[in-house]
Amino acid sequence: MRFSYIVASIGVVAGCSSGTRTTQSSPSPAQVQAPAASAAEMRRDTAARASSPAGAGAGAVSAPNADPFASTYRPYASRATVIRNVTILTAAGPAIRSGAVLLTNGKIAQVGASVNAPADALVIDGTGKYLTPGIIDTHSHIGGAASPGDQGAQTDDVNEATNPVTANVWVEHSVWPQDPQLPRSLAGGVTTIQVLPGSANLIGGRSVVLKVVPSRTVQGMKFPGARYGLKMACGENPKRVYANRGPSTRMGNVAGYRAAWIQAERYRRQWDKWNETHQGDPPQRDLGLETLAEVLRGNILVHNHCYRADEMAQMIDIAHEFGYKIRSFHHGVEAY
């Protein structure tokens, strides 16, 4: 039986990108094109960037808590819209048969058997169709590992496989807003994605949360107020990628995590002391330790690629040792 969806379809494909990738058949850019931002959209994005205030401490010797790449996303102007006579899958309770949804200012305002819509609202008849909330995909490499994919330097930008610990990189600097996968995802009902670095490294760098909207810059897609994440990976991926230089074993992986967090603890204490007293010169900035220190402060959320139950337990032990929390395990095939 085929279901017809208006806003979103059910189903999320969450992928993993490690140091090696399998080649998959992909349409050529001529077959699938991301919608080019219109001149009005480009002007709006440029104006938003120009009007955005600089991060706290911008221009200072060091601004370890600033966001130098702040969101410039602005919602599109929209007309009040009501969808009637539709089966609503709320994801929070039973389905609503022959229900209605009111959208105002680009957001869901009312859901139920009936809604109070403005007289001038656009009315869409959803008879015979299903309606769901937009899907939030918390594990994506879209934009960073763009399609059509390759094994070279053109579109594969999610693994900075030059060191087992690359907390200094931010995946948003690899996101290509014209990736043809973006409109495909939106057509499938995915409205928000967390783009993660790949799983080649013990610590792969910062993630970013994006709205799936046309934009010429990644800042124009960034979800306002969403926290950064930190991608970590355990098990076979890092030890396979770094087998010739280390870590080449799981015990080497664990030693690598602990060494990184020990450095981050020291860095955090140095900066906390200077922020309290402002005496003397501030500590030298280190982008990688800066990210890890923000994890220890609770400002950046850890997302951990891990397969085996015993390794998940080990990662939880490490989190307890250094006082941070793991927000989610990804690919946790033994999480049950």
Predicted features along the sequence, with ranges:
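Bacterial signal peptide processing site
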Residues: 17-19
